[in-house]
Amino acid sequence: MDLYKKAYIWVFLLIAGITFFMTAFFYKTGFFPYTPIHSDGNGYYLYLPAWFVYHDPGMHFVQNLPPDPSGFSGTFFPMPTGQVVDKYTMGVAILQMPFFLLAHVITLLFCPEIADGFSIFYQLSNIASGCFYYFL
């Protein structure tokens, strides 16, 4: 591998790392008014905690979640059977799954009491998945 190719790889990794940390910093400082998982993103993301945290593919658990802080509603529709239907497809959740599972394992190992699918490690994994696919 020649020197220029190595330099490009390091520059790319540096820019990707800066992008991740700046995004996380802006969410933490309140520059963005909401958490990374909100509004439409919440609808795409909810398949992951439904399957891996709550073991509830019928999404009954959404009735116990706090309201979306962005004020967005209309993501879920209760059915006569008692199940809840998410109007968003699961393609985004499938792409986010490796990052979510890593966050879930880290949370279970170090902070099992906050393994709810929405705590800080899950939020950071959501940022990481967005940055990863942006640079891909």
Predicted segment positions?
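Short helix-coil transition/hinge motifs at the ends and kinks of transmembrane helices
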Residues: 32-35, 105-121
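Start-transfer (signal-anchor) and selected internal transmembrane alpha helices
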Residues: 1-32, 126, 130-133
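Transmembrane-helix motifs of polytopic, lipid-linked glycan transferases
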Residues: 99, 120-136
